[in-house]
């Protein structure tokens, strides 16, 4: 820390004695009610991630009151929460001259709570001591138009961090009314006194017992002192809403008994299907006002709910439900987005089938219909089935799944799911996803694996069109595609004839059977269901004998050939669109039934995760630091870190890298430790990066933490802040990038050092610290003093940086400074000490002299004369004294006078006029000769003063005669005459210029147009204003004009062009031109004071004939005005 430069002094710091003590009382609205409630009482209530009770039932946090309400329609108000408050956060600084005012408009409030405080409260003395301080605030309410002080508050003590307090006020005036916070202590103007005050918030309190119907809530009261300056966060482990579940369903065992009759019963369940049903049909928080229960397909959800409850391997050797929903819906979102989250987690999609909202799940199911070339629309190109494939970049083989881990404080965990074979073949292609409502690692793994297998296995999309048969399935149904072009053989068609007696079918196209294996043919029976029968023989390629003919097989029905070497091609319909011609366009994506078994049995985890907080889930590393030290020319780094909680069975991996010359990172060292500290030794200079992460015995890794540090000489200070004080200057260096290992060397000089290399030999070394207070009676106001500062650390030192500053120029402040010094001295105490006189109007004359040594062996001596008198109960004193004292600044001699008036009189030649008088905080002198004067404000005599200079640099003078140079950056001049030459190096901008300049104007003649021909015709007028005090000349620049000649069939015609020019109405030119060009120009004198000059230019043309327009030309009118006898040019 900083040190003084006069003598050795160790700064003292008083203890912080201001601590915020507030009772946190909060009601958290948890959910739309009713809900099941806490899982395990107070063990399920966590404050700042710490349960109120531990797993053994012992108290972790004392003094906590928790009240729970399930959210029934009729529930009792929570006890201890009889008032309801609405807090308005301000966080506004309150300054001395700027009270903060707010208006209260709420009509129903009963009380107001003001929360206010200080950001810090500490005073630093000139010796570096940090002491308590105080600040005063007023809380005021405007009553009957005037401000009334309700609370007068003084905050007294010391704190280096924010301190808040609060007051509550009742008896409020009628609404609306104004409230304000006012600071009575002047604002600090220096860093030595930190006492910024703030109005943190105000709370409008209503004294009413509320029961909060249909709202599940938790009320918590806790003393915030247990949490220091931290914000108290609340988390609750709860079972959620009481849902409507099927009447034959047991949510605890997840068993369905008998046949469901379609009725419901209330129960808690985390089955995602019934959570979705609740959201869609609930009239308050869900979509029940737009969708009735009859508009949602509960039978489809019943099947999906059973699918979600089926047990699958959990990856640890046990089983768990396939899909559960443990989620909080905490923000308002679009209904479709929430619906999509639910459906994607259940591997289904919502479909409106025209009557109800139903759901189609991506799971194995029977095919609904078969399509081949015979029952689809055949396009002109002969390819009815059009295929598209997903891009390779969209086929991910690794996915990072974010899910909520109950064993890690319900924090977000990431499960990495990979397909190693696909990675080896295509390279790693990673994506990320959030598993909605997932609190199971196995479910998160299945969600990621489902995404990978869907993208890798189901890569095809088919589009085709059908007739009325397009209505045989709906979106979501599985269909089969038998495409002869894709298979390379005939795989489907129509049955032309059926002979049930001979079991022979006549097909519409030839088929070929394999040499081995059993071939099957699929036919449609009378119920519309596909039936497969064995093919026994084929005659003539189209007559097929089968093992049996299903009942109801009709002519022109569809057949499909199944061969042992031909895989069945299944697709799931995703859309059906009606075309303009009455056909239907179908889009379907590839369906692989085996995907479900691959996914549900694909999770295999090593080890078993514990269900306790002190399990083996590796925690995150936090608060990582690296401290560099030197040892015999070599450098060491001590790394320290901690974790949010103590976790058994974990160690820490450390990885240290250094930045190479090419910018890449080179590995220096790795280490593993079970401690939270580690020391690296024998490190070279360079820029390092250290990464630490926790790892458990099974190789699972927690979130890492990294810190960068530098083993090198420090950078020089980027800037130096110099703060003036009374006979002192505080120097505070700043680095461009904060480095806690860096301190600063301070060197001091009263003169500037021309060569920075001579700092150590030509200046005085002050010391090494983070800042320095250079304090001495020799540091005078109005003089420049120079600091030379460089950064130092264990590796080396930076270059010096120069800073120049001055002591304070606050004269009034110096008087207060001296007042403290004088009253603390022995002589000052003797002169100002009051003696109790026994009678009124009594007086006392005393002369005294003393000489002594105190306990610190300091020598002191004084002599003084003092007169005291008491009159009308008031004490008066006059005195004069001399002293010599030993002080901390050294030997000090004083001459003090105590009097209302001090004067010096020269009585020579009978003169009685004093040459110097001091009275009433003013000094009067007739004639003063000074070598140097420092005065923030200078004012001359007169009313108003003829001359003044203010501290902000504003100079005011009625008349100034400056014989030297004037340098100015900005300003305004009025009615100024420049007697001689003026040079302008920059840009000159003038609204109006009168003088030796040239003005010009130009314009083209108007034009007439006929068909595609246009020609000049019309008048232009130029007006020259008589606004100059000297003679000028008007110059008409050459104006050219001409007509044209035309010869057709030996006959010649002319189009003539005529120009007439007038000056003030008199013709000065009248000319005509055929095909030969004519030119007009003129110079006209314009004497000053004769009035304006008006020039009129008129141009006309003649036609070649009645039906042939003129072909004429004229240049622009151009006029210049110049001074008649211009400077800088002459003709001899």
From Swiss-Prot:
Organism superkingdom: Viruses
Entries under SUPFAM superfamilies matching the protein: Fibronectin type III
Region (Interaction with host LamB): 883-1132
Entry keyword Repeat: yes
Places the protein is found: Virion; Host cytoplasm
Entry keyword set: Host cytoplasm, Host-virus interaction, Late protein, Repeat, Viral attachment to host cell, Viral attachment to host entry receptor, Viral genome ejection through host cell envelope, Viral long flexible tail ejection system, Viral penetration into host cytoplasm, Viral release from host cell, Viral tail assembly, Viral tail protein, Virion, Virus entry into host cell
Domain Fibronectin type-III residues, every copy: 618-711, 712-807
GO biological process, one term: virion attachment to host cell
Entry GO CC: host cell cytoplasm; virus tail
UniProt keyword Magnesium, yes or no: no
Pfam families linked: FNIII-A_GpJ, Ig_GpJ_C, Ig_J, Ig_J_second, Phage-tail_3, Phage_Tail_Tip
Quaternary structure, from the entry: Interacts with host LamB.
Protein family membership: Belongs to the Caudoviricetes tip attachment protein J family.
Function as written in the Swiss-Prot or TrEMBL entry: Attaches the virion to the host receptor LamB, inducing viral DNA ejection. During tail assembly, initiates distal tail tip assembly by interacting with gpI, gpL and gpK. During virus entry to host cell, binds strongly to host LamB in an irreversible attachment. The binding induces structural changes in the tail leading to viral DNA injection through LamB trimeric pore.
Protein name as annotated: Tip attachment protein J
Highest classification ranks of the organism: Viruses, Duplodnaviria, Heunggongvirae, Uroviricota, Caudoviricetes
Gene that encodes it: J
């Amino acid at each position: 820390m900083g040190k003084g430069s006069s003598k050795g002094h160790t700064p003292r710091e008083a203890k912080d004695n201001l601590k915020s003590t507030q009772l946190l009382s909060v009601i958290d609205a948890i959910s739309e009610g009713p809900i099941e409630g806490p899982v395990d009482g107070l063990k399920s209530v966590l404050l700042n991630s710490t349960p109120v009770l531990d797993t053994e039932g012992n108290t972790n946090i004392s003094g906590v009151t928790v009240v729970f309400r399930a959210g029934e329609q009729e529930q009792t108000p929570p006890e201890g929460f009889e008032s309801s408050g609405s807090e308005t956060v301000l966080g506004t600084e309150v300054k001395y001259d700027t009270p903060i005012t707010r208006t209260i408009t709420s009509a129903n409030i009963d009380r107001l709570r003001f929360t206010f405080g200080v950001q810090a409260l500490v005073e630093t003395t000139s010796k570096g001591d940090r002491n308590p301080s105080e600040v005063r605030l007023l809380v005021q309410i405007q009553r009957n138009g005037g401000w009334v002080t309700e609370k007068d508050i003084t905050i007294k003590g010391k704190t280096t961090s924010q301190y808040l307090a609060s007051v509550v006020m009742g008896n409020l005036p009628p609404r609306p009314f104004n409230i304000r916070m006012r600071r009575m202590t002047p604002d600090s103007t220096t860093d030595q006194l930190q006492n910024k005050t703030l109005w943190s918030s105000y709370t409008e309190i209503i004294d009413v017992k509320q029961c909060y119907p249909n709202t599940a809530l938790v009320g918590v009261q806790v003393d915030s002192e247990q949490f220091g300056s931290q914000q108290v966060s609340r988390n609750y482990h709860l079972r959620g809403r009481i849902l409507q579940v099927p009447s034959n369903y047991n949510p605890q065992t997840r068993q369905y008994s008998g046949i469901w009759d379609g009725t419901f019963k209330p129960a808690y369940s985390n089955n995602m299907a019934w959570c979705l049903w609740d959201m869609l049909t609930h009239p308050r928080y869900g979509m029940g006002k737009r969708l009735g229960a009859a508009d949602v397909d509960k039978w489809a959800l019943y099947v999906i709910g059973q699918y979600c409850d089926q047990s699958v391997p959990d990856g640890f050797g046990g089983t768990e439900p396939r899909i559960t929903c443990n989620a909080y819906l905490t923000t308002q979102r679009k209904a479709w987005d929430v619906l999509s989250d639910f459906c994607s987690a259940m591997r289904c999609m919502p479909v409106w089938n025209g009557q109800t909202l139903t759901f189609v799940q991506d799971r194995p199911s029977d095919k609904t219909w078969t399509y081949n070339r015979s029952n689809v629309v055949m396009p002109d190109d002969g390819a009815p089935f059009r295929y598209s494939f997903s891009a390779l970049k969209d086929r991910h083989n690794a996915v990072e799944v974010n899910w909520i881990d109950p064993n890690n404080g319900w924090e977000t965990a990431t499960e990495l799911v990979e397909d190693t074979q696909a990675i080896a073949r295509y390279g790693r292609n990673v994506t990320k996803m959030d598993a909605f409502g997932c609190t199971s690692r196995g479910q998160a793994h299945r969600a990621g694996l489902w995404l990978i297998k869907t993208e890798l296995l189901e890569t095809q999309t088919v589009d085709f069109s059908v007739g009325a048969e397009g209505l045989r399935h709906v979106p979501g149904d599985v269909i089969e595609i038998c495409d002869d072009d894709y298979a390379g053989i005939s795989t489907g068609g129509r049955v032309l004839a059926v002979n049930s007696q001979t079991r022979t079918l006549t097909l519409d196209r030839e088929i070929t059977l394999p040499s081995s294996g059993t071939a099957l043919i699929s036919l449609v029976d009378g119920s519309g269901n596909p039936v497969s029968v064995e093919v026994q023989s084929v005659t003539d390629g189209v007559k097929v004998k089968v093992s049996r003919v299903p009942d109801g097989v009709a002519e022109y029905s569809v057949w499909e050939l199944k061969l042992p070497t031909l895989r069945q091609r299944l697709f799931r319909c995703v859309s059906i669109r009606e075309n303009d011609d009455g056909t239907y366009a179908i889009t379907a994506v590839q369906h692989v039934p085996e995907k479900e078994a691959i996914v549900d049995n694909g999770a295999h985890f090593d080890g078993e995760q514990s269900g306790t907080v002190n399990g083996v889930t590796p925690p995150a590393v936090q608060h990582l630091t690296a401290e560099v030290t030197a040892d015999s020319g070599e450098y060491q780094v001590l790394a320290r870190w901690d974790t949010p909680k103590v976790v058994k069975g974990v160690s820490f991996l450390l990885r240290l890298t250094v930045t190479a010359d090419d910018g890449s990172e080179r590995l220096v060292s790795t280490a593993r430790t079970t401690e939270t500290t580690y020391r690296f030794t024998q490190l070279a200079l360079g820029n390092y990066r250290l990464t630490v992460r926790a790892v458990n015995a099974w190789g699972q890794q927690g979130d890492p933490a990294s810190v960068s540090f530098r083993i090198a000489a420090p950078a020089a200070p980027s800037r130096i802040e110099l703060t003036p004080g009374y006979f002192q200057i505080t120097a505070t260096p700043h680095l461009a990038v904060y480095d806690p290992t860096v301190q600063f060397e301070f060197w001091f000089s009263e003169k500037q050092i021309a060569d920075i290399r001579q700092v150590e030999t030509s200046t005085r070394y002050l010391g090494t610290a983070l800042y320095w207070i250079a304090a001495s009676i020799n540091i005078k106001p109005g003089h420049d003093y120079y600091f030379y500062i460089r950064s130092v650390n264990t590796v080396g030192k930076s270059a010096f940086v120069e800073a120049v500053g001055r002591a304070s120029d606050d004269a009034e402040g110096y008087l207060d400074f001296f007042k403290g010094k004088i009253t603390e001295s022995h002589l000052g105490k003797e002169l100002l000490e009051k003696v109790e006189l026994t009678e009124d109007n009594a007086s006392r004359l005393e002369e005294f002299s003393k000489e002594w040594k105190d306990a610190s062996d300091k020598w002191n001596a004084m002599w003084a004369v003092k007169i005291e008198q008491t009159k009308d109960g008031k004490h008066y004193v006059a005195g004069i004294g001399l002293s010599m004292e030993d002080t901390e600044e050294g030997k000090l001699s004083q001459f003090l006078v105590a009097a209302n008036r001090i004067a010096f009189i020269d009585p020579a030649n009978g003169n009685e006029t004093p040459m110097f008088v001091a009275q009433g905080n003013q000094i009067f002198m007739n004639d003063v000769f000074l070598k140097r004067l420092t005065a923030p404000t200078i004012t001359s005599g007169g009313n108003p003063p003829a001359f003044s200079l203010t501290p902000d640099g504003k100079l005011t003078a009625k008349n100034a005669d400056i014989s030297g140079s004037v340098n100015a950056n900005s300003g305004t001049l009025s009615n100024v005459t420049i007697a001689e030459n003026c040079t302008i190096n920059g840009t000159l901008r003038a609204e109006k210029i009168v003088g030796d300049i040239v003005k010009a104007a130009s314009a083209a003649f108007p034009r007439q147009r006929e068909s595609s021909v246009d020609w000049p015709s019309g008048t232009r007028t130029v007006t020259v204003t008589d606004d100059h005090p000297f003679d000028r000349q008007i110059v008409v620049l050459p104006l050219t004009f001409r007509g044209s000649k035309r010869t057709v069939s030996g006959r010649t015609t002319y189009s003539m062009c005529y120009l007439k020019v007038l000056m003030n109405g008199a013709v000065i030119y009248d000319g005509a031109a055929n095909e030969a060009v004519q030119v007009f120009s003129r110079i006209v004198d314009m004497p000053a004071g004769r009035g304006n000059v008006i020039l009129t230019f008129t141009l006309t043309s003649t036609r070649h004939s009645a039906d042939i327009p003129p072909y004429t030309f004229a240049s622009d009118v151009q006029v210049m005005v110049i001074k008649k006898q211009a400077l800088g040019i002459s003709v001899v």
